[in-house]
Amino acid sequence: MIDDDGYRPNVGIVICNRQGQVMWARRFGQHSWQFPQGGINPGESAEQAMYRELFEEVGLSRKDVRILASTRNWLRYKLPKRLVRWDTKPVCIGQKQKWFLLQLMSADAEINMQTSSTPEFDGWRWVSYWYPVRQVVSFKRDVYRRVMKEFASVVMALQDNTPKLQSAPAYRRKRG
């Protein structure tokens, strides 16, 4: 389903843990990493597509996460010309995305990249919040920057509410 401007409706998913780190997934058989994302099917809402993609790509269900935020607007990126499939009709020149920020409520062990017969990812790790902006492929970088900027206050508030380990008072020797 491509819109009149040539953009495919899509959802993007940022999953964070209680420490404010985000899940960074490695594309199957590649050295590139990204957030989970996927197309919205006809008749499907963005939220329904997000839950479907969450299960297909990461193996998590509704009970494993909670929605913390979603982007106010659709965000777009253009594909590099070398990635556009010019022989398809209509031609898709890029993606328009609605992004969701989710908090993982289950254990990390619930994450399973192999639920689909054609997995999108073959690995994942927790990374610092801003890390993906510097590491994603260049044509997605502006969208990632905008998404992370929009979600930053929510994730930082989450970090502020995480109990911190108390360090033992430092031992000081009296002088004199």
From Swiss-Prot:
Domain of life: Bacteria
Keywords: Hydrolase
Required cofactor(s): a divalent metal cation
Signal peptide from the UniProt entry: none
EC number of this enzyme: 3.6.1.-
Name recorded for this polypeptide: RNA pyrophosphohydrolase
Gene: rppH
Pfam families, alphabetized: NUDIX
Source organism (scientific name): Salmonella arizonae (strain ATCC BAA-731 / CDC346-86 / RSK2980)
General function of this protein: Accelerates the degradation of transcripts by removing pyrophosphate from the 5'-end of triphosphorylated RNA, leading to a more labile monophosphorylated state that can stimulate subsequent ribonuclease cleavage.
GO molecular function annotation: mRNA 5'-diphosphatase activity
GO term, biological process aspect, one: mRNA catabolic process
Matching InterPro entries: Nudix_hydrolase, NUDIX_hydrolase-like_dom_sf, NUDIX_hydrolase_CS, NUDIX_hydrolase_dom, RppH
Span of the annotated motif Nudix box: 38-59
Cellular compartments per GO CC: cytoplasm
HAMAP family according to UniProt: Nudix_RppH
Domain Nudix hydrolase: 6-149
NCBIfam families given in the database record: PRK00714.1-1, PRK00714.1-4, PRK00714.1-5
Family: Belongs to the Nudix hydrolase family. RppH subfamily.
